[in-house]
Amino acid sequence: MEQLKVEVDPKQGGDLPSIYTLQFEELEMWLKEQGEPKFRATQIFEWLYEKRVKQFQEMTNLSKDLRAKLEKHFNLTTLKTVTKQQSSDGTIKFLFELHDGYSIETVVMRHNYGNSVCVTTQVGCRLGCTFCASTLGGLKRNLEAGEIVAQVVEAQRAMDEQGERVGSIVVMGIGEPFDNYQALMPFLKTVNHDKGLNIGARHITVSTSGVVPKIYQFADEGLQINFAISLHAPNTELRSKLMPVNRAWPLPKLMDAIRYYIDKTGRRVTFEYGLFGGENDQVEHAEELADLIKDIKCHVNLIPVNYVPERDYVRTPRDQIFAFERTLKERGVNVTIRREQGHDIDAACGQLRAKERKEETR
């Protein structure tokens, strides 16, 4: 095993690092440095991820001395809930405040097969997708791994109140996950760890807008995690208009990276395709999309987009959505239409955060 060096700066207050940032092996090493036995790591992880305590003093099978050390070195209240909204369909949306005053969003979605949580990886986003509220205001900073993990913990606490559990995770919230790769990978390892949140790899999905170098790196990780690509256009010209990231890594380079991922992992990918009225939702676009992906092991997820007041795009009519789906199916494409959720609580990425920011500046 690669040796881990744990460097923890014992500051006070909000500057303390989140305990959720530590992977299991890192916690074991920190405990060793403190003169504590390694088995304490299992006990601490149980308190964090099974019992989901909010204070170190609740970890009653630890010595008072160890609890004091934990309080001195780590922060356990990583997120502060600003608002919690529940949609008529059961979707729950959180607006969390971070220690430095920035805010992020997390969404819990109810499905027939269980509950999933959509987590955020950045405060804002630099990629500037023209249809997305997440990019309003640009990128402020990356989240730490612990700030991403804490979103899942808070979501599970909300489910605890209703006697339910979070069964899957989608990394599709605010930000580009591959722009925060250094926090993404520790997050994935902790939520998948059998002593952590213990969510199976095939119940975790990571989505990217198309940061091509990181797709190759992610493929080489050898994970069994689900992989999705925000595609949204069937040709490079239209994609560059909708998604400026395509100017850095044009569609042909993206498709090459996706083929590498499939060859390396043996897993299929999901293409997320948002339908924007009059932009990318015509039958000819569906035909072009079918040609683009005809040799790729994939699934297409059509997304009737939520209206974003700050953007100009309009919703595609229902009959046009079904025509698009039918065209793909006729050409042998595995396709579904995503069920709308949270439409009445601003559940599109970044909308709640944007609304909060707007109210603060009035």
UniProtKB/Swiss-Prot annotation:
Annotated disulfide bonds: C118-C349
Domain of life: Bacteria
Essential cofactor(s): [4Fe-4S] cluster
PROSITE patterns: RADICAL_SAM
Compartment annotation: Cytoplasm
Domain Radical SAM core: 111-344
Binding site for S-adenosyl-L-methionine: G175, E176, S207, S230, L231, H232, N306
GO biological processes: rRNA base methylation; tRNA methylation
Other known facts: Reaction proceeds by a ping-pong mechanism involving intermediate methylation of a conserved cysteine residue.
Protein name as catalogued: Probable dual-specificity RNA methyltransferase RlmN
Source species of the chain: Halalkalibacterium halodurans (strain ATCC BAA-125 / DSM 18197 / FERM 7344 / JCM 9153 / C-125) (Bacillus halodurans)
